[in-house]
Amino acid sequence: MTAAESIAASINQIDEKKQKLKKAFDDLQAHRSLLSPSFNLSWSEIDSHFSSLQSSLFNRLQSAVTSSNSGNIETPTAVTTETPVLWPELRKFCEKNDGKGLGNYMIENSRKRLSINEELPNAIRCSENPAALVLDAIEGSYHCSSPSSSSSARAIDVKRIFVLLLEALIEINANLTNDLRERARTIAYDWKPNIGNKPSEALGFLHLVAAFELGSLFSTEEICDYIFLISKYKQATTICKKIGLDRNRIGVLVQKFLDTGRLLVAIRFIYENEMVGEFEPVSILKTSLKNSREAAKRVCAEGNYSLKVQNEATDKELSALRAVIKVVKEKNIESEFMEEKLEECVKELEDQKAQRKRATKFNSPANPQQPQEQKVDNKRPRVANGSSMEYNLTIPPLRPLQQPPLLPTPSQILQVNPYGLLSSILPGVAVPYGNPRALFGSVPAPASRPVFYVQQTGYGMPPPQYRPPYYPQ
């Protein structure tokens, strides 16, 4: 086995290992009550991270194989033999023009679709009629997308595979005939009633319309409504261009995004359609920052400033803040955001989360050394007004609590009576426990009732912090 084949085999094992990781994550979630309140990582975030790594590794492997083979003039066919390292079955189905088999094979391996997607365009090119191959694959599996099964996991996988096939077809710019368009039109008319308010259905439908150039069969208003429905997907802007929406329609869409609070989606459409002159992206980004700040305050207030709610509000604001920072860096508009100090705001919010976590550990019941009066007086602080940073939305930094020593020093102890008053220790006056020096003996005198102590100031010592004595009720 060559080095490339060994690496490819390891990449293929990523999906299997992810399933084991998901099982461990589910087991961890079963004990969520024992986890820190700041632990809010979801499986979708973990899956997205490893899928991105898998795709990146595969691309680098293909680049390495291609570059090494391009330097060898005597073996020009090495590229074709080495490139489909991971999924040679794709090419077999395409060479046989077996669209139904291709669709079923991809659905069965839908959990590895990101890896498959890297090789799919080149595999489809091996078919005599790529457009017919894709239609055969869709028609052969379309029964899975019926309304009765639309909520099943398999139906969701089917829609994702349809999108991958249609994206690959758009990428290779395959030849289309009238017969193929008629077949696609029939599928589109059957598909449309199932869309409703389901973005995944709208995404597949729009890819079908774009791939087979069916935009003229539907009203522009319908197309815009469906694009608005799929606006969270990164393919939305590409679909707009492929279907052929004019600039005015896209401008109406952008305004609709702004009116409904989807400011970052509007920013994406503005930049990718080169509409900076019609809108003001810097102002929109600053409005997004303001909205995220106000939303965090509102969430904290509605949740009575509980620790969980504060962490959730901080996480949402951090997410919005990082999204703005990403756009600012990608578009090289850092100079417009000098006053906002975005990176410093991120650091402050992260510090607040860490500080709350430390305070939670210190005040937890597992800490047996915390005195009673501190637990009683340790009330939840409210939001600090007038803080130095704009993004200080939750609790202000907490000062670490100072614990008194477990055993007071002899010079700081005076005997008190059961009512909390100092007992008389004048010469010749009896005290309940005999000589006052007995207080400092190695064996304490027996007490007939509880005795309470108040810390006193020794000679030459600064006055201690006032702590009211505890009186039994």
UniProtKB/Swiss-Prot annotation:
GO terms of biological process kind: cell differentiation; flower development
UniProt keyword Coiled coil, yes or no: yes
Superkingdom of this protein's organism: Eukaryota
Residue ranges, annotated region (Disordered): 356-384
Stretches assigned to coiled coil: 3-35, 306-361
Sequence ranges of Polar residues compositional bias: 361-373
Family matches, as Pfam families: Frigida
Keyword vocabulary terms for this entry: Coiled coil, Developmental protein, Differentiation, Flowering
Note: In cv. Columbia and cv. Landsberg erecta, either FRL1 or FRL2, but not both, is functional and required for FRI-mediated up-regulation of FLC.
Protein's job: Involved in flowering time regulation. Required for FRI-mediated up-regulation of FLC transcripts. Partially redundant with FRL1.
Family under the similarity heading: Belongs to the Frigida family.
Name listed for the protein in its UniProt record: FRIGIDA-like protein 2
Organism: Arabidopsis thaliana (Mouse-ear cress)
